[in-house]
A protein has these predicted regions:
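Conserved acetyl-CoA-binding loop-helix of GNAT-fold acetyltransferases
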Residues: 119-132, 144
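Conserved glycine-rich acetyl-CoA-binding loop
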Residues: 114-125, 137, 154
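Conserved GNAT acetyl-CoA-binding A-motif
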Residues: 134-147
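Conserved active-site alpha-helix within GNAT-family acetyltransferase domains
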Residues: 146-172
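A short beta-loop-alpha structural element at the N-terminal edge
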Residues: 31-45
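C-terminal "cap" of GNAT-fold acetyltransferases
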Residues: 15-20, 165-191
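Conserved beta-strand in the GNAT
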Residues: 75, 89-100, 104-112
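Active-site rim helix/loop that mediates acceptor-substrate recognition in acyltransferases
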Residues: 47-81
Length: 191
């Protein structure tokens, strides 16, 4: 029997398109909200990713790439209002994308958390959001290419050989300065 999107969301226990929150462990006055990205997040996403790519910790993302894949992104933002370029008056502190690659395969991409918010479970919650969405779409294999495999192992992923991934995933890699000598580690989780 066909289940509507709403029924599938309810079965998953979470509606991926509505925000959720966590409290920062060492600062109970700070709350981080997780939601899908909005058009006004693009500049903040670009700045976050650029900071990591300049440090060699992440592959760069162009503005056009962020716009094209905006629907893939989850955002983590503080509940504390700030002034500046932030989308809704809150500070964007992390982001992550789930990119569907093939029939039963998706990639977690562009996982980044601002340095002051690192090691506060924000990255773990962003991954969890992506895994819930993958489950909603009945995708059971989720991989990532990462410079931080231990973080993904902590979150239930296993290291795999890059040769286990389909050739299609390398289409993004052609424009990378490190292609074909990729120094990232491939990790995968099966739901």
């Amino acid at each position: 029997m066909y289940k509507s999107g709403k029924e599938r969301f309810e079965k998953a226990g979470v509606d991926i398109y509505f925000p959720s929150k966590i409290e920062i462990e060492d600062d109970p006055n700070k709350v981080v909200i997780f939601r899908k990205a909005l058009m006004c997040d693009v500049k903040s996403l670009y700045n976050l990713f650029s900071e990591y790519s300049k440090a060699g910790e992440m592959l760069p993302r162009s503005m056009i790439d962020i716009y094209v894949h905006l629907r893939d992104y989850y955002i983590a933002e503080t509940e504390i209002e700030t002034e500046g370029e932030e989308c809704r008056g809150y500070e964007l502190v992390g982001a992550c994308a789930l990119s569907i690659v093939w029939e039963n395969l998706a990639e977690i991409r562009s996982l980044a958390v601002k340095k002051p918010y690192a090691r506060k479970k924000i990255g773990t919650e962003l991954i969890r959001k992506c895994l819930i969405e993958a489950n909603f779409f009945k995708i059971t294999k989720i991989f990532a290419l990462t410079y931080k495999p231990q973080f993904f192992i902590y979150n239930g992923f296993k290291i795999i050989e890059k040769s286990e991934l389909p050739h299609k995933i390398w289409s993004d890699c052609i424009n990378c300065v490190k292609f074909p000598d990729c120094d990232e580690t491939a990790v995968m989780i099966q739901l």
